Amino acid sequence: MPVHRINSLWLKHISSARPVVRVIGYCIALAFALCSALFVAAELNPQKMQAVMQSRYGSDGVALLGAWNRMLDSSRSLDNREKITQVNDFFNRHIRYTDDVTLWQKSDYWATPLETMGVRAGDCEDFTIAKYMSLLELGIPTEQLRLIYVRAQIGGAQSKRFQAHMVLGYYSSADAEPLILDNLISRIEPASKRPDLRPVFSFNSEGLWVGNSAQSQADPTARLSRWRDLLARVREEGF
């Protein structure tokens, strides 16, 4: 497993974590890489996606899928900064926030992009997953994207209330400060402009990075099975 570099201003390198956490982190990173390899090598199957969308969600779902495909087609020639803006705006505009219990009758469910577009709703994880997979489809390298679990401060700068949250980080280079794509706010901001977010750990299709937070409310090991299940369902839907 290669040594991963990460912006020291926001997330600390996995090697700075406690030894036990570091060993577990590397094992999880390897498992993420193995179960993600098939997805990374896959190509989009628009016909299959449309057939699945039609059978599950009808004409409304197909209409949004068509809009998503048109957004992708019109964004392919753009630079990466413009691509992340187009994708962020698309999902923040078309998807409404709804919790998993209301949508799926489960306490924690990771929806595929097709499911999220089909019901036009999702929680923070669903927004992030849909944006991540859309940007991979637009050709942004995996190593420039991270799904990041954070503790989000709710109620202003003086508030002591935090909740578990997920955002997408875009890294223009290995040492760059990440730009944060979030469903809580419409604009894309650098991490330094988001003091309301406290990073816990992050991952992508290559591995997982763990910081020093002792207050993590999102166990990385519990997420691996959901990630594997998500990738399997994504493939079945033609992504």
Label the predicted regions.
Residues 2-10, 34, 38-239:
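A structural boundary/capping signal
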Residues 25-35:
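Bacterial N-terminal signal peptides
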Residues 17-25:
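N-terminal Sec-pathway targeting helices
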